């Protein structure tokens, strides 16, 4: 998914936003797939807005920009609340039965074809349509009745567009801890927006029965599900951050920070996984460093595939950049 900045700008200039508002909830809708670049600070939402406003009337671009505004809203909540976004914000999650990640989700073995295919796509590409994120999080939190944070951590780790604010607050919205009620969807809803026709699943029921379709009112897993699913049903999801950072260092040895390759008495521009702006101080002679801090990735782990995407995007678009793996205070 890596791309040059010039090529991405051409996509922005040629994008036709008119169908976005009416089709964005469908998995084959007119979405852009720009979120990895916006989340990395590589593509400016302001630039996108300016381009769309220049070439299209308000009726065409307003729906797109309203969705962009949600990301900005989540950022402002994170800015105000800090790490509290990792806890139930407005109300406590109710009826938690599982404390970790349900294995049918981790193993893409839920039996819901659209969801299982989406999990495979997430693992393979780091991309997941927004509606499928909602389906996955509601299945995890409200149907499997699992604590929302382990699921949010799992999804965050695999997304190329990982963003603590948007990810964790969206999961809280679905779980009902950052909204007035829990979000649920049945099989008919999933079929409609994913262009599938599956029937006979545990979600193929009326809404009033959905939240007891796997775990009943006595908090017991219905025995019919245990034929295809493991017992226990959940497992802790973990990522070995230290090993991943070592692998990144080995794969990108020629770009690893070397003090002898820097210019003395020259300012530094320090980039990170949320600031890969290719236009940042481009008219100045500076030392350019991509900072990958173990402390950050211990708190917000990502997979090696995601981290390599960040490195590749930086190397492709920021001339002369070096990679420093360490915490800022260690430099």
Model-predicted regions and their roles:
Residues 2-5, 12, 17-66, 70, ...:
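Trp/Phe/Arg-rich N-terminal binding region typifying the photolyase-homology
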Residues 187-251:
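Long, charge-rich alpha-helical interaction segments
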Residues 166-208, 330-331:
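Beta-rich, aromatic/charged-enriched effector core domains that present basic-aromatic interfaces
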Residues 137-143:
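Hydrophobic/aromatic-rich effector regions of fungal transcription factors
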Residues 132:
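Active-site-proximal cofactor/substrate-binding loop regions of enzyme domains
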Residues 138, 153-156, 162-176:
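Metal-dependent DNA replication initiation modules
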């Amino acid at each position: 998914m890596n791309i040059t900045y010039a090529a991405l700008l051409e996509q922005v200039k040629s994008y036709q936003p008119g169908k976005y508002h009416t089709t964005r909830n469908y998995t084959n809708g007119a979405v852009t797939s720009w979120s990895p670049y916006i989340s990395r600070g590589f593509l400016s939402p302001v630039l996108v807005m300016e381009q769309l406003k220049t070439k299209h009337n308000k009726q065409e671009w307003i729906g797109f920009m309203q969705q962009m505004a949600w990301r900005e809203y989540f950022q402002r909540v994170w800015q105000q609340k800090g790490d509290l976004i990792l806890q139930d914000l407005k109300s406590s999650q109710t009826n938690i039965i599982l404390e970790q990640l349900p294995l049918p989700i981790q193993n893409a073995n839920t039996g819901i074809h659209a969801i299982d295919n989406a999990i495979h796509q997430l693992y393979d590409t780091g991309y997941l349509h927004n509606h499928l994120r909602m389906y996955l999080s509601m299945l995890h939190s409200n149907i499997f009745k699992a604590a929302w944070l382990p699921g949010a951590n799992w999804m965050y780790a695999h997304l190329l567009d990982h963003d603590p604010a948007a990810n964790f607050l969206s999961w809280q919205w679905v779980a009902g801890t950052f909204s007035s009620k829990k979000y649920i969807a049945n099989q008919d809803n999933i079929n409609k927006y994913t262009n599938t026709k599956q029937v006979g699943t545990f979600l193929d029921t009326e809404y009033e029965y959905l939240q007891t379709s796997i775990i009943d009112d006595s908090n017991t897993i219905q025995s019919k599900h245990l034929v295809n699913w493991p017992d226990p049903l959940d497992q802790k999801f973990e990522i070995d951050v230290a090993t991943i950072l070592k692998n990144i260092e080995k794969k990108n040895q020629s770009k690893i920070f070397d003090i002898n390759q820097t210019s003395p008495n020259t300012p530094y521009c320090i980039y990170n996984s949320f600031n890969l702006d290719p236009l940042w101080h481009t008219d100045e002679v500076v030392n350019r460093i991509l900072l990958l801090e173990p402390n950050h990735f211990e708190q917000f782990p990502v997979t090696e595939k995601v981290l390599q995407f960040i490195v590749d995007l930086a190397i492709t678009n920021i001339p002369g950049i070096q990679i420093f793996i360490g915490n800022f205070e260690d430099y």
